[in-house]
Amino acid sequence: MNTLATSLQTYFTTFARTQRDLSANTISSYRDTWRLLLKYLAATLMVPANAIDFDAVTAPNVTRFLDHLEHERGNSARTRNARLTAIRSVLSRAMPDHPEHAATITQVLAIPPKRTIRAVIEFLTPEEVTAVLAAPDPTTWTGRRDYALLAFTVQTGLRVSEVCSLTLNDVHLGTGATIACTGKGRRQRVTPLTRATVTVLATYLDERAARPGTALFCGPTGQPLSRDALEHRLAKHLSTATSNCSSLAVKHVTMHTLRHTAAMNLLAAGVDVSVIALWLGHADTHSTDAYLHADMSIKQAAIDRTRPLDVSPGTYKPNPDILAWLTAL
């Protein structure tokens, strides 16, 4: 076994799990990155994957691999950067043990991440939320479950992975009703529930008690719902909701859109960004600042506060009479 293979085994069996205590999702992502990289190098260098050592993991080869991911596999710049992070993590850990490869590793570590475009956050209006919540069939158990699931997510703003991992023990519907979850970076947080959400969950839990298992939102036989299952159920209800709310047709709505909607509702209610960051489980307010850019009402209010005293509030509207406008010009 060559030094690269040994370093990979040491990283994933000892360093990642024991010393860094990385999450299972992070370990899986890093593992998949190295599987892709080794397969790519084996194909391009025409050598067996087992024969690839540190001398093949050069900056030019890694850069070409990242380009391959983006241009041939169709990965986004964000995914490309995540793959680069995985490569860097393993090489950074290996460099002290293999100083003979320090020059090669240092050049790889110097590869810069690709700049990404942060799109404006998409969220649902109150009318669109109403249409989505009205879509599940209330005459079936799955319809009533889906209604509870969607209403719960819109209010709490939990990530889809957090919703999937919730158990019955995470719910407290007594005085000061809350939901406890473990989010990214295994940061634990407790989110308060509104009276309306408590009522919805209490009704759902009465029916949920007849099914086995501990998952909060489960299938008919008690099995936990997967991320794909949640997205599938939402897509099904969106097709129904769109017929009653045409604005949904031009939006790409996912479970994460419901999270964005919860954040925008808090922002519209005047909640401080730092509090919203805590609510969503963000490590800092940098990620939460994106919601400020998405809310046009905040920008309009800023314009109105800075307008001259003799100018009425609102945005500019051109004079529909073009001849009058030209005369006054």
Question: Where are the regions that the model predicts?
Answer:
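Conserved catalytic core of the tyrosine transesterase superfamily
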Residues: 1-329
